[in-house]
């Protein structure tokens, strides 16, 4: 926050709306072009920006910086404008204060992406964006605080998990300053001295900064930064993945090891990365045809349902259950002499798979982003020309992107980085969990990491479908 240029910008109270406004305008353009523009996906801004450029930029920003998309989220700008006229009256139901709804929506989006071929449909893509805006207005129109962000938004949950590997975090500079603070404006909000009205809100995601650990559930909204009267909160550097190696109690979250909903989110994040990539390689068609014949299922939804059930439920239960059983058998009792329960073991070590899952998302999304890097230019030229003012010239449809052989090297690098990260995290968990026998506790999870990494490597070497571009693959 003290970086020349950037520091003053982020400390400015209206920095977030300034970043949100361009993305809101871009979202409106995407919706209009998706509904009324060309029906061919590679010539439409909705599909090109959504499925090629946005996803690639998103994962790269998460890797290199942090959850800055949530900071600039255009949906929240619309929500904030609506709240000037309609104040939410209800608190989010206690029974739903978990990730189960967002996990389900995450799976639904992955499923719909394949079933409706969203990458090839500007119309469906536009309505997906519209649906997102409407969902935000409905949820946060009725419920206080940032209920949509914390409990509903599937994109936000993806960002939360991925940002555990980011090099920056919103956190306090000096704990002593927080200890001496009596107002706790970072969570309560800053109040006017006379009227006692909140002039700058505190954290709407219930993350009390002195007890906050890591990036989980943090949208980088900077409300706490602006509310703090001591300028004691900033965007500070940290060791990526460090928050995955320990299990302290976390403000607004609790213990990772006791959150089965968070574990389910991590499972969908990791195994969903492989599943999403599997949907674009040629062997998927052979598998779908074989399943359709074997199960006598004609509709694609039924076949996809079987593939999703195996990939997101059966496979994780089998692999993680086996690894937890071997860890219990090889590592013996805990350091306190208590026998190890199977489910808590699986829950605790599952977080070690996050780097590998993120490596697969990086490899997959950057493949599309880099190979179609320049496709935005002719699509924009064509969109401008359709308005009768072709001042950008004729569309240059021959523009593509980085050669695929170079991109493949980058993909391998991401996967190697993900494997290394997962091995380091799982070994750190093993040392903490079994200080006397860390290697025995570590080996089953190292084997799981190796299996998933080999599957990821196999995927990136398959012929891939060049979705949302005019290229063939």
Where are these regions (language model features)?
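Membrane-embedded alpha-helical bundles of multi-pass integral membrane proteins
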Residues: 1-185, 201, 207, 225-226, ...
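Conserved short loop/turn motifs at secondary-structure junctions
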Residues: 66, 212-215
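Solvent-exposed, extramembrane regions of membrane proteins
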Residues: 190-213, 232
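A short, cysteine/histidine-rich metal-binding "knuckle" motif
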Residues: 213, 223-224
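A membrane-cytosol interface segment of integral membrane proteins
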Residues: 217-218, 229
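Alpha-helical membrane segments and immediately flanking helix-loop junctions
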Residues: 190, 221-222
């Amino acid at each position: 926050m003290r970086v020349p240029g950037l520091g003053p910008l982020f400390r400015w109270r209206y920095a977030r709306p300034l970043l949100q406004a361009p993305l809101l305008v871009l979202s409106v353009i995407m919706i209009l072009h998706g509904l009324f523009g060309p029906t061919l996906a590679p010539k439409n801004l909705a599909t090109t920006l959504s499925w090629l450029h946005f996803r690639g930029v998103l994962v790269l920003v998460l890797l290199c910086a942090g959850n800055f998309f949530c900071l600039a989220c255009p949906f929240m700008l619309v929500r904030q404008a609506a709240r000037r006229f309609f104040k939410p009256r209800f608190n989010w139901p206690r029974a739903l204060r978990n990730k189960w709804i967002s996990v389900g929506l995450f799976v639904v989006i992955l499923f719909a992406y394949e079933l409706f071929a969203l990458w090839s449909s500007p119309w469906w893509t536009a309505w997906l964006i519209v649906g997102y805006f409407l969902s935000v207005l409905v949820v946060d129109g009725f419920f206080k605080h940032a209920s949509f962000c914390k409990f509903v938004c599937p994109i936000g949950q993806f960002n939360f998990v991925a940002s555990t590997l980011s090099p920056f975090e919103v956190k306090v500079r000096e704990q002593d300053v927080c200890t001496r603070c009596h107002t706790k404006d970072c969570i309560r909000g800053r109040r006017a001295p006379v009227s006692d009205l909140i002039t700058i809100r505190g954290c709407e995601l219930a993350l009390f900064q002195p007890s906050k650990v890591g990036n989980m559930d943090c949208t980088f909204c900077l409300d706490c930064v602006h509310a703090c009267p001591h300028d004691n909160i900033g965007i500070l550097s940290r060791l990526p993945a460090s928050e995955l190696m320990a299990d302290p109690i976390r403000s607004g979250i609790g213990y990772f090891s006791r959150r089965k909903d968070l574990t389910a989110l991590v499972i969908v994040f990791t195994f969903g990365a492989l599943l999403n990539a599997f949907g674009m390689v040629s062997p998927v068609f052979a598998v779908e045809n074989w399943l359709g014949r074997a199960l006598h299922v004609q509709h694609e939804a039924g076949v996809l349902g079987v593939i999703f059930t195996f990939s997101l439920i059966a496979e994780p239960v089998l692999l993680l259950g086996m690894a937890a059983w071997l860890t219990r058998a090889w590592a013996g009792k805990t350091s306190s002499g208590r026998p190890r329960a199977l489910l808590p073991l699986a829950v605790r070590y599952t977080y070690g798979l996050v780097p590998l899952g993120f490596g697969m998302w990086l490899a997959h999304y950057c493949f599309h982003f880099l190979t179609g890097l320049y496709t935005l230019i002719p699509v924009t030229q064509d969109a401008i020309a359709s308005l009768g003012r072709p001042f950008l010239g004729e569309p240059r449809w021959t523009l593509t992107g980085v050669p695929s052989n170079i991109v493949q090297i980058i993909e391998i690098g991401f996967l190697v980085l993900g494997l290394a990260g997962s091995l380091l995290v799982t070994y750190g968990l093993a040392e903490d969990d079994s200080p006397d026998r860390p290697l025995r506790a570590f080996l089953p999870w190292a084997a799981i990491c190796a299996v998933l990494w080999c599957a990821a490597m196999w995927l990136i070497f398959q012929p891939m479908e060049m979705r949302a571009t005019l290229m063939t693959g």
